[in-house]
């Protein structure tokens, strides 16, 4: 049945529009003859480049391909922060990370924050959520928190276990990520038993953990590592011959922030080509399983006669490096980490359309309000995607020709800011002077191996000015440093004098007890220093 269903910018252009610019509308407030239903499926760690050529050649993704054929694909969609909670906070609030102050995986939105789903409910929509949300404060382990807070204390530079792979050698094992499948089943059952009987439009959210790597159970040398875990059933969906072995810069030539990240992720050592290829293959197989869960939702809508009445949106909170730039996980502004899938299909959405404009996850909020016919709030960071995805809109240039992404969490020792335009990717760090920026021309250097910031000083200067007009990033960096100190002090005081023994057993601090006095003294010195971004 599944197979049957599947068959059937140049710098001067950056001037406008700015967020909140007078006269610029963030959407067209289109009114459908019949209000459409909406289904939003959000996965975790899905590299957006897999949804178009040439990345699409490496793994079979039939339902993503179906959405491409019957809807609109955004070829340059980005996360606003390449880590789970801050990214999701941006998506659910429509605000950039520095506005939500979601600095790490523990700090998100207030539980009572008004999301786009709340507004849609007030405008007549029935609403339901299943699966991973992760946009409010209070989640994730104390290890994540302490590592993020203390990233400026150099001695805390500790390595995780190396990334691993694990194969279930069964050709019939389909449901590998049981939790995601159960939530998908819950969503399908809700569509069948509840939504299909509604006289009002509905909005359904399904959050998936895949293709995020699994935590490794080992407590030995791979303690704290992550495992790319799949079955033979899904691995057979991957074309090994199409897997690209990423090029790496020599360790001595790596940007200092990249080296820090690579070291903490235990990727500075030697890896065989087979190891790298397996990590990437297993990751792609996990993407195939993700696609199948998206397919369950699409099939259910079709079987219930709801597909032609429903706008389906698929995206992810961020990507996965999968050994590009000597790293796995995310926490980086490189394409594998920051580029996300974004596909939309349904009534009023143009079929088989590829949109090259740069967009980001803050655009989800105004898009949802636009679909519901709700007033579009003027303080949002994002813009509705509907003018770009529907031929019913006369004006196509409402969205600015840039997007902003920022990162302030663990595995990186400097606040990071990315301004992405049609041609350029500009990455600034910390206070803007203590860490060298990066500039990539993605049209000629898609692998982002050559930093040309010093070769094109005028472009670098212009992009930095534009970035500073959007966000006072030196001030934001200082605010994050102050926040980190305050949070660590509060945690330390809650633990009491025993804090040294507690920190010794956290995920990234196993060797603390070798020289506890030295480490405690370093913590004290860090807490007493002025709140300025660290010089690297």
Spans of model-derived segments:
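Short, solvent-exposed loop/turn segments at secondary-structure junctions
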Residues: 45-48, 82-83, 97-98, 133-136, ...
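Active-site-proximal cap/lid insertion segments
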Residues: 16-19, 28-36, 45-58, 157-177, ...
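A structural signal for well-ordered alpha-helical segments within the folded catalytic domains
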Residues: 36-37, 58-62, 111-118, 178-188, ...
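Catalytic-site neighborhoods of secreted/periplasmic enzymes
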Residues: 90-186, 190-196, 217-219, 223-229
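Cleavable N-terminal signal peptides of Sec/SRP-targeted secreted and luminal proteins
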Residues: 1-15
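Short, structured active-site-proximal loop/turn typified by the sulfatase FGly-forming signature C/S-X-P-X-R
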Residues: 52-87, 94-95, 121-128, 244
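C-terminal cap/loop subdomain of S1 sulfatases and analogous C-terminal strand-loop tails that border
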Residues: 184, 318-324, 362-365, 370-442, ...
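C-terminal, low-complexity/hydrophilic appendages and adjacent surface loops
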Residues: 135, 222, 335-337, 405-454, ...
């Amino acid at each position: 049945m599944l197979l049957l269903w599947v068959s059937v910018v140049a710098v001067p252009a950056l001037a406008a529009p700015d967020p909140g610019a007078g006269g610029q509308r963030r959407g067209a407030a289109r009114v459908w003859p019949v209000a459409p239903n909406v289904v939003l499926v959000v996965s975790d760690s899905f590299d957006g480049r897999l949804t178009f050529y040439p990345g699409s050649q490496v793994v079979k993704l039939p339902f993503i391909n179906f959405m491409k054929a019957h809807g609109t694909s955004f070829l340059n969609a980005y996360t606003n922060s390449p880590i789970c909670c801050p990214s999701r906070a941006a998506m659910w609030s429509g605000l950039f990370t520095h506005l939500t102050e979601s600095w790490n995986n523990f700090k998100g939105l207030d539980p009572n924050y008004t999301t786009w789903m709340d507004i849609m409910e007030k405008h007549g929509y029935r609403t339901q959520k299943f699966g991973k949300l992760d946009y409010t404060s209070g989640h994730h382990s104390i290890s994540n928190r302490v590592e993020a807070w203390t990233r400026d204390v150099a001695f805390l530079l500790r390595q995780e276990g190396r990334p691993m792979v694990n194969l279930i050698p069964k050709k019939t094992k389909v449901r590998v990520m049981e939790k995601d499948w159960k939530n998908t089943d819950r969503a399908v059952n809700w569509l069948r038993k509840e939504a299909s009987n509604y006289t009002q439009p509905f909005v359904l959210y399904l959050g998936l953990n895949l293709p995020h790597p699994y935590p490794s159970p080992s407590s030995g040398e791979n303690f704290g590592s992550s495992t790319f875990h799949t079955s033979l059933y899904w691995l057979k969906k991957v074309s090994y011959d199409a897997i690209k072995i990423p090029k790496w810069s020599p360790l001595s030539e790596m940007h200092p922030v990249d080296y820090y990240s690579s070291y903490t992720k235990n990727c500075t050592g030697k890896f065989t080509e087979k190891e790298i290829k397996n990590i990437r293959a297993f990751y792609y197989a996990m993407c195939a399983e993700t696609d199948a869960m998206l397919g369950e939702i699409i099939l259910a809508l079709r079987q219930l006669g709801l597909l032609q009445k429903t706008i389906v949106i698929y995206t992810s909170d961020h990507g996965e490096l999968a050994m590009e730039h000597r790293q796995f996980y995310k926490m980086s502004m490189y394409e594998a980490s920051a580029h996300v899938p974004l596909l939309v299909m349904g009534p009023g959405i143009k079929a088989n359309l590829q949109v090259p404009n740069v967009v980001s996850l803050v655009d989800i909020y105004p898009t949802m309000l636009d679909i519901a016919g709700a007033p579009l709030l003027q303080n949002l960071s994002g813009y509705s995607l509907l003018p770009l995805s529907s031929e019913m809109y006369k004006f196509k240039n409402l969205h600015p020709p840039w997007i902003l992404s920022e990162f302030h969490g663990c595995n990186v020792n400097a606040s990071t800011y990315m301004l992405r335009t049609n041609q350029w990717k500009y990455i600034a760090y910390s206070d803007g002077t203590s860490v060298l920026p990066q500039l990539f021309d993605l049209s000629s250097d898609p692998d982002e191996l050559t930093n040309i910031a010093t070769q094109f000083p005028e472009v670098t200067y212009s992009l930095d000015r534009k970035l500073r007009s959007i966000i006072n990033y030196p001030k934001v960096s200082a605010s994050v440093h102050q926040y980190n100190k305050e949070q660590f002090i509060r945690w330390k005081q809650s633990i009491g004098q025993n804090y040294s023994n507690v920190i010794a057993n956290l995920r990234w601090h196993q060797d603390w007890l070798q020289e506890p006095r030295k480490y405690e003294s370093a913590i004290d010195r860090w807490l007493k220093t002025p709140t300025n971004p660290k010089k690297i």
